[in-house]
């Protein structure tokens, strides 16, 4: 999607309140990708993305900014936590697995696009498979009259199938089942093993299953995709997208920083993770299920609160690979008020719509919203600052009884005012010990 930095920021304003500096830097970084793709291939190789380090406490919008943009622009995007990785040689996930995760995200993205583009062909394939089971084909040598009768019956059955009249009927279908897919406890790294067994033909088998037609439609989607879509071109496009448009969001980067004033036995392992991360961020080749992926032009966005450490505690080489730094603002009561009122699908709108399903019309007057924002802001100041996430806790506590007794208010309108907010939350916020457990 070809958007100018101003248009990108305008889009983000609908979802993330404030944080103008962060929005501006990310908008420029994404626009530079578009600019790079307009250059000659030789020059494209020399221009590397300027990776970003976002500094700010939890709940201020670091992840949301990156996630919203990636989704809007159709970029492969993954969010990982730096603290979940271990140094090579230790038990746990190694840093290369984040690149493999990005490859999978790109593959799923392209597959979904192709499925949508070829929806009619896929639906026709599934339809024909089900109709074969409902009305098996006639043997050869049948009279023209019988063939005409069969054709008419088939069209009637097709109409019923399309209208959903047969959804509850049961049929037996044959589907491919991979033995690795049936075990959810296997680690993601088993993806490489899955590719190997596919090649040698082990681990996948056809199984017959009885199911309702509406379930059979979903079960046959993968098989239809495998048969109709060009898998090699999908992999090729996914590899290209991951290399040139991929975004890896590394959260909790501060957790692997070695604080100069706090050395402990885990520090060597933390520094080891940083050193393992360095070649990935600098640019290297990683083997994935879609081919060898070059990380040279992936955009890395690292983020952390840096309460117990500071960016300078990262190893110098890694610091140099994140040249763009932006500090995000903490959210005061005014910002929290805007978060409750401005976004398209604001928190208050979400709660109102949820209770609307119970035929209850819920409204918040302006004074109540301001009081909610004040209480959330005060809780953040007096306890740990968790940003906008505090609003979830505050509103849940405020509406707890109403949600429980919603059926009693069916067909009525319920207005939340300042008095109700003070009654429900006032005593809790005044009692600090109690507030720590409830808010």
Curated annotation (Swiss-Prot):
Gene3D superfamilies, per database record: 1.10.8.60, DNA helicase RuvA subunit, C-terminal domain, P-loop containing nucleotide triphosphate hydrolases
Binding site for ATP: 17, 59-64, 251, 317, 389
Repressor keyword on record: no
Gene Ontology MF terms in the entry: ATP binding; ATP hydrolysis activity; peptidase activity; proteasome-activating activity
Subcellular location per the Swiss-Prot or TrEMBL entry: Cytoplasm
GO BP: any one term: protein unfolding
GO CC annotation: HslUV protease complex
InterPro entries per UniProt: AAA+_ATPase, ATP-dep_Clp_protease_ClpX, ATPase_AAA_core, Clp_ATPase_C, HslU, P-loop_NTPase
Keywords: ATP-binding, Chaperone, Cytoplasm, Nucleotide-binding
Chief place of localization: cytoplasm
Pfam families from the UniProt entry: AAA (PF00004), AAA_2 (PF07724), ClpB_D2-small (PF10431)
Keyword Nucleotide-binding among record annotations: yes
Family membership noted in the UniProt record: Belongs to the ClpX chaperone family. HslU subfamily.
HAMAP family in alphabetical order: HslU
Its job: ATPase subunit of a proteasome-like degradation complex; this subunit has chaperone activity. The binding of ATP and its subsequent hydrolysis by HslU are essential for unfolding of protein substrates subsequently hydrolyzed by HslV. HslU recognizes the N-terminal part of its protein substrates and unfolds these before they are guided to HslV for hydrolysis.
Quaternary data: A double ring-shaped homohexamer of HslV is capped on each side by a ring-shaped HslU homohexamer. The assembly of the HslU/HslV complex is dependent on binding of ATP.
Listed name of the protein: ATP-dependent protease ATPase subunit HslU
Organism per entry: Campylobacter jejuni (strain RM1221)
